[in-house]
Amino acid sequence: MGGADKNRERALAATGDELTALLHHPDAEVLLALLDNPSLDEAQLCVLLERKSLPGEILEEVARRKPMLKNYRVKRGLAFHPRTPRLVTLRLLRELYLMDVVQLTLLPGIPTELKRSAEDQLISRLPQLPLGQKITLARRGPARLAGALLAEGHAQIIGIVLDNAYLTEAQVLRALSRERLPPGVVRSIAQHRKWSITYNVRLALVRHPSSPLATVLAYLPELTVSDLRELASPGIVPESLRKYLQAEVQRRIRAREKSAPGEDTAGPSAASNED
């Protein structure tokens, strides 16, 4: 019997420390034999799944063995392994605990399709979740989930989710693109220390019908003339606001005529956006 055959025989019958040592064997055939060892328990299988260099064929074999997947730690270890086939992980997503799905979306290097599927699953669960879990997700959830929570507009959640480190400008703008938002959402964004000074967010707040007039008027001097003109076009904002936009455009034109040619008359935060 050759050395490889002997190692496979050892893997099939090993127990105790010998079995534990074989969990780190480099030969995939030995590892496959270990999976058939009746002494292999869930804890040892989880140790095996912690090997980042584990061959894909081992992961596929574990995924095929339904009795092994009855153990949640094994299921989780398989789903989180970077070499697990994408279709296997997608199938396991439905069986993971909520916060494990959140953690999966935040893994460095997670494939885009897999991350999006995990986020979609989290968003689909939101209507059934109690407030306490939503608050946890508002603090720690990925960008798309944070954006969905922001759009829901729960008073206890808005401030928390706006402070979420993963929340992106794109998600804030997506929320503001909805005409029907709980009033607290628009007000909280307009008062937030980070988002209220972001140019594109200010622009979206000016567009939004629920924005307080005082907030909108305070932003007008910071907008570029081209954006003011676009906003003042018919049908973009209420007629009651258009007159203020048109007045601001005229003020800029008069100021520009009085200034030296080429001198910028927009506010400092809009200088890089001016025509």
Cite the ranges covered by each PLM segment.
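Alpha-helical scaffold segments
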Residues: M1-D275
